[in-house]
From Swiss-Prot:
Enzyme class, broadest EC rank: hydrolase
Protein name: Imidazolonepropionase
GO term, biological process aspect, one: L-histidine catabolic process to glutamate and formamide
Catalytic activities: 4-imidazolone-5-propanoate + H2O = N-formimidoyl-L-glutamate
Cofactor(s) required, per the database record: Zn(2+); Fe(3+)
Cellular component aspect of the GO annotation: cytoplasm
Pfam families found in the cross-reference section: Amidohydro_1
Main location: cytoplasm
Organism: Salmonella dublin (strain CT_02021853)
Xref: NCBIfam families: hutI
Length: 407
């Protein structure tokens, strides 16, 4: 009989979808095993027969499915206002590029966010965060990028820090100052990039407000040369990088980010084979964002077969934002990734667990159920993982465990 220490907690009578690639079964499924949690981490996974059937801190889950906590590795959670009017314009025929050129798009949200009080931004973001937590999300990336000036970018990152301090969900904050050219720099995008590189990145990094630097390399964002300046600045300071690339056109952004060993290349609808090869060589995760593809009514799909062939890890994220993916649901993103992009259910699950963890640099501690990993997991009223993906309007969450505590 396995000896338990005081304070150990056990989940038994469960189906474990470990998402551990070392296990041969789909989803890393194992039956007749129990999960032992100690001090916020998974201590061990052991046969049921090694443990008592009942006792203090032993939870009988009556055969329910247990998976790692979900990870949303790409969100723009902190913002004010909405862009419903722009969506109506698009329904009437206007393009995303046209709306952006007219001062809409990202800059419309920038104006609303700059004017919004920090406490109001916090309350708005907290409600969104709790919606994701209610779906089983235990690790969440939050980007800045709706300030486009030092003071407001810092304000957004402070909100992310305040959310993290609640200890309800892990937050991975990202500086996305190179999101768009603000109105005051409309005729001088290079000057704005200088501000980002010489002021925003070093000052906000020194304050410990973010974990990685992101950028938008696109015709409506920044060109390759401007993007590389951002990457060079970040890497000189030892900051991990990532990029929004190849969403609306092929500029070579994925190759660029991969040359700097980027954590991830996100969107990637127009990614070509050279870009896929570069991502493999750079250890860069491909992050699929089907919500934006759907909402913008795009037709160019990411090259999923190429990503498989080159064995590039593929993550899936909500891309929750007010302009192009107003979907605060990772379950929906998983379903969309399967229906629109052709992922299997198992690939979608890997995309919101172990591959999403890799996209945030957390692959050694998050995204799998195995010894020494964080005890972040979800108990579902389901028998098979596909059930969560299949019916996104229904939330079968039974219990969410964060750092070993039922939350």
């Amino acid at each position: 009989m396995r000896q338990l220490l005081p304070g150990d907690t056990v989940w038994r009578n469960i189906r474990l979808a470990t998402m551990d690639p070392q296990r041969q079964a789909p989803y890393g499924l194992v039956d007749n095993q129990a999960l032992i949690v100690r001090e916020g981490h998974i201590c061990d996974i052991v046969p049921e027969t090694q443990l008592p059937v009942s006792g203090d801190n032993i939870h009988d889950m009556q055969g329910r499915l247990v998976t790692p906590g979900l990870i949303d590795c790409h969100t723009h959670l902190v913002f004010a206002g909405n862009r419903a009017a722009e969506w109506e314009q698009r329904l009437n025929g206007a393009s995303y590029q046209h709306i952006s050129a007219q001062g809409g798009g990202i800059n419309a949200t920038v104006s609303a966010t700059r004017a919004c009080a920090e406490e109001t931004l916090y309350l708005l973001a907290r409600e969104r965060m709790m919606r994701l937590a209610s779906e089983g999300v235990t690790l969440l990336e939050i980007k800045s990028g709706y300030g486009l000036e030092l003071a407001t970018e810092e304000k957004l990152l402070r909100v992310a820090a305040k959310l993290a301090a609640e200890n309800a969900i892990d937050i991975s904050p990202t500086l996305l100052a190179a999101h768009a050219t603000p109105a005051e720099y409309r005729d001088d995008p290079d000057g704005y990039i200088t501000l980002v590189c010489e002021t925003m990145i070093p000052q906000l990094w020194q304050k410990g407000l973010f974990d990685a630097v992101d950028l938008f390399c696109e015709s409506v964002g920044f060109n390759v040369a401007q993007s590389e300046r951002v990457l060079q600045t970040a890497k000189a300071l030892g900051i991990p990088v990532k990029g929004h690339v190849e969403q609306l056109s092929l500029l070579g952004g994925a190759q660029l980010v991969s040359r700097y060993q980027g954590l991830s290349a996100d969107h990637i609808e127009y990614l070509d084979e050279a870009g896929v090869a570069a991502m493999r060589d750079g250890g860069t995760v491909g992050v699929l964002l089907p919500g934006a593809f759907y909402f913008l009514r795009e037709t160019q799909r990411p090259p999923v077969e190429l990503l498989r062939r080159y064995q590039v890890p593929v993550a899936v994220a909500s891309d929750f934002n007010p302009g192009t993916s107003p979907f605060c649901s990772l379950h929906l993103a998983m379903n969309m990734a399967c229906v629109q992009f052709g992922l299997t259910s198992e690939e979608a699950w890997a995309g919101v667990t172990r591959h999403a963890a890799r996209a945030l640099g957390r692959q050694a501690t998050h995204g799998q159920l195995r010894a020494d990993y964080r005890a972040d997991f979800v108990v579902w009223d389901a028998e098979q993982p596909v059930e969560v993906v299949y019916e996104p309007g229904r939330n079968p969450l039974y219990q969410r465990v964060y750092r070993g505590q039922i939350s």
